[in-house]
Amino acid sequence: MNKLTLLHEGKAKKVWQTDDPDLIIQEFKDDATAFNNKKKGSIADKGVTNNAIASRLFTMLGENGIPTHFVSKLNDRDMLCKKLDILLIEVVTRNVAAGSLVRRYGFAEGTVLEKPIVELYLKNDDLDDPLMNEDHAVALGLGTYEEVAQLKDMAEKINSLLVPWFAERKLRLVDFKLEFGRHKGEILLGDEISPDTCRFWDAESGEKLDKDRFRLDLGGVEDAYSEVKRRVLEQ
């Protein structure tokens, strides 16, 4: 499968048209950003690491009935995917209080939530990806009430699969962001699942093993990503 036209370059990936109009190649970059592109940098081999992690996770989810855009891992940096009409809704699922949940509502960081919280955000960097509810999403023409409910249902099912899967690997899935899109009338999970889009804490030490190490200048970013990759791929 050949890369033809560059369709889009985002903060973490390039998207290429292929010989097949229904398929794209998602190329993972080493660029790192935080706070909606206000902080920029690079993480050595991040693209290689995230492609490996995301490919493994998409495969696992697909085997458990979650429809995804993943087709195959082509090489270290490239993933073959179904071409999606991206829904401009980011779905964040939270199992443990961290990040903006702590800042907005005053939770103590590390508080285990009695029930996972599913949040919707408008995918718009210019507006700093504001939090929204179902009514906002429908009013903005981003989807129907039924589609928004489907996104939340899918996020909850994905969470129910990921939490125990990561727990077996001594990783606590604190929270994570998902993106979805339409492909031939079906809503599929898109984008990636990686330390760029998830908060992972070591289940025993509580050490942060995700992009918070970059966001918060904690150091050891490459080692943290590599450790997640090692645990994801070892079983």
Swiss-Prot record:
One of its GO terms (biological process) is 'de novo' IMP biosynthetic process. Pfam families: SAICAR_synt. Pathway: Purine metabolism; IMP biosynthesis via de novo pathway; 5-amino-1-(5-phospho-D-ribosyl)imidazole-4-carboxamide from 5-amino-1-(5-phospho-D-ribosyl)imidazole-4-carboxylate: step 1/2. Keywords: ATP-binding, Ligase, Nucleotide-binding, Purine biosynthesis. It is an enzyme of class 6 (ligase). Transmembrane segments: none annotated. GO terms for molecular function: ATP binding; phosphoribosylaminoimidazolesuccinocarboxamide synthase activity. InterPro entries: SAICAR_synt/ADE2_N, SAICAR_synt_PurC, SAICAR_synth, SAICAR_synthetase, SAICAR_synthetase_CS. It catalyses: 5-amino-1-(5-phospho-D-ribosyl)imidazole-4-carboxylate + L-aspartate + ATP = (2S)-2-[5-amino-1-(5-phospho-beta-D-ribosyl)imidazole-4-carboxamido]succinate + ADP + phosphate + 2 H(+). Its EC number is 6.3.2.6. Belongs to the SAICAR synthetase family. This is Phosphoribosylaminoimidazole-succinocarboxamide synthase. It comes from Chlorobaculum parvum (strain DSM 263 / NCIMB 8327) (Chlorobium vibrioforme subsp. thiosulfatophilum). The gene is purC.
